[in-house]
């Protein structure tokens, strides 16, 4: 009789994402890179001169899990307002890691606001803004170097200020605002974005300043992904280990805005690239935070909520799966760190929920079975299922009141 050969012992496959090793960079009380959890950030949309409104907006974001908050600082008046915003947060709430967003010709603004925030974000394409010449056909090396020298002269005081205060800087490149000289030299490409960042990094390094985070954002996902991959490649070649801030700029709103952001951010995170993220939506900033945490949870990078496993439903399903999943979620959504499976029938139930802490499975009409891991604990009438699940979690000491 012919027999099948014994199966070769499979080598376990490590499924956890291996993150790129980066240097730790402080932003207030939060540290990004250096193996720290991927941090979540957003940006308020209030005018910074509205001090009361800005303080309230920062607090709203921080209270729902936004760990770093960015504020726009387009003028010296806005920069000075940040002192009052910071002080009010200290007095009425708590210190919040704050980032000042500085753009056009922002040297004086950046120097002023650096006194009051934890991190200054500059855009290399706009920090020293040269108005494009409409009839230009080329950039000579001399012209390129001349502007480079001006950039260094302008950037140096800010670098020294941040360095001496122990603060940090984000070199934030945007695909849509590359400097004219970069466009002429490298084109409207990921390479131009990377070289723009590297120019500023080299200036910072020459001044012994290494508290840097880098971002390369674009409104088109393929460009954003390519730019960040190339940035990592170039940094590896140059022996640099700066943390990366990920985001798809101008992603829009609604379902597609979330899909677009996830497509860019999650692709890179899955490759181990990225130390802090922002989902940019044309909605209230508070709407961005759950999307960020959802991405991190789905990839296994952070556990901040219940992980629900549920089948898509089919003809074998023995109860209204969508309705029951909703009830289970409403009863348990405030918990953290649990895996709960809701399965419609016995065919796929036990196997598909093998990694779950608790299972809710349809076995026969009108009844459901509750599982603790792989062990069936009890069978109860369907109407009592959710309450019985809650009692099981409580009995195991894993319940907290909402």
UniProtKB/Swiss-Prot annotation:
GO MF terms held by the record: 4 iron, 4 sulfur cluster binding; 4-hydroxy-3-methylbut-2-en-1-yl diphosphate synthase activity (ferredoxin); electron transfer activity; iron ion binding
Biochemical pathway: Isoprenoid biosynthesis; isopentenyl diphosphate biosynthesis via DXP pathway; isopentenyl diphosphate from 1-deoxy-D-xylulose 5-phosphate: step 5/6
UniProt keyword Metal-binding present: yes
InterPro entries named in the record: Dihydropteroate_synth-like_sf (IPR011005), IspG_bac (IPR016425), IspG_bac-typ (IPR004588), NO2/SO3_Rdtase_4Fe4S_sf (IPR045854)
Family: Belongs to the IspG family.
HAMAP family documented for this protein: IspG (MF_00159)
Name of the protein in question: 4-hydroxy-3-methylbut-2-en-1-yl diphosphate synthase (ferredoxin)
